[in-house]
UniProtKB/Swiss-Prot annotation:
The keyword Hydrolase applies. It comes from Syntrophotalea carbinolica (strain DSM 2380 / NBRC 103641 / GraBd1) (Pelobacter carbinolicus). InterPro entries: dUTPase (IPR008181), dUTPase-like (IPR029054), dUTPase-like_sf (IPR036157), dUTPase_trimeric (IPR033704). The lineage of its organism: Bacteria, Pseudomonadati, Thermodesulfobacteriota, Desulfuromonadia, Desulfuromonadales. The keyword ATP-binding does not apply. This is Deoxyuridine 5'-triphosphate nucleotidohydrolase. NCBIfam families: dut, PRK00601.1. Its EC number is 3.6.1.23.
Length: 147
């Protein structure tokens, strides 16, 4: 397994560093660092601060993903998933969560609220053409293979 170094800056004295929770985990858990409890009403969304900023190396991105346990047990997930952290972003990581559940969801400082996966980035060079190669699928879109 390849490793890279990512610089982390604590923006708040109580900020917790992302952490892998098992030896082969692909994602590091991200921790909430609000000033106090944050209550997210059913159907509502909010941004939860993490208290950290990252310097992701050029050639990589951070993908912020939901935690499956929060989705299963509370109906809480991320609004934009995966969220992308570019290599040139240096601000605080904020996690935009939404409560699809039926009850208030309370986020407390130190709660694990999302996962961070580091992935390589490949930049595309676009080539304008008059025609595209034919495929068996061609323009078949949403649900074209059945439900």
């Amino acid at each position: 397994m390849k490793t890279i170094t990512i610089k982390v800056k604590r923006l708040h004295s109580k900020a917790m560093l992302p952490a892998y929770m098992s030896p082969h985990a692909a994602g590091m858990d991200l921790y909430a660092c609000p000033d106090g409890e944050v209550v997210v009403k059913p159907g509502c969304r909010t941004i939860v601060p993490t208290g950290i900023a990252l310097a992701i190396p050029v050639g990589y991105e951070g993908q912020v993903r939901p935690r499956s346990g929060l989705a299963l047990h509370h109906g809480v997930t991320l609004v934009n998933t995966p969220g992308t952290i570019d290599a040139d972003y240096r601000g605080e990581l904020g996690i935009i969560i939404i409560n699809h559940g039926d009850e208030d969801f309370v986020v407390s400082p130190g709660d694990r609220i999302a996962q961070l996966v580091i992935a390589p980035v490949h930049r595309a060079v676009l080539e304008t053409v008059e025609e595209l190669d034919e495929t068996d699928r061609n323009e078949g879109g949403f649900g074209h293979t059945g439900f």
